[in-house]
């Protein structure tokens, strides 16, 4: 699973997932999986989608992961009263806005890429769409 190697601060404020996204173009591969909705993707979901794609294309071509889970999410154990400080870090998430390209792929036929991205999209908690690279 992906997580930061080291952070200046271990815990983070909740914050708000607003604004527009950077990384809206397919820049590395031929095909991409773009987020249509806004949300949080956990490191486990990113890895599960990557595995589904890799297995479907039988390790052909190349896959790029364009999101990184750098936001720590904390939680308190069950049946613990409130107060006594912020909970421990449970997992890491990547916050995504509409238009963000999540994965890219090249070296496989378009039909196979569409099928692989459909499998990956089933593992993700937000709506996605298939995009191709714009050639000038």
From Swiss-Prot:
Disulfide bonds: none annotated. Keywords: Ribonucleoprotein, Ribosomal protein, RNA-binding, rRNA-binding, tRNA-binding. GO terms for cellular component: cytosolic large ribosomal subunit. Pfam families: Ribosomal_L16 (PF00252). GO terms for molecular function: rRNA binding; structural constituent of ribosome; tRNA binding. InterPro entries: Ribosomal_uL16, Ribosomal_uL16_bact-type, Ribosomal_uL16_CS, Ribosomal_uL16_dom, Ribosomal_uL16_sf. Gene3D superfamilies: Ribosomal protein L10e/L16. GO terms for biological process: translation. The keyword tRNA-binding applies. Binds 23S rRNA and is also seen to make contacts with the A and possibly P site tRNAs. Belongs to the universal ribosomal protein uL16 family. Part of the 50S ribosomal subunit. This is Large ribosomal subunit protein uL16. It comes from Psychromonas ingrahamii (strain DSM 17664 / CCUG 51855 / 37).
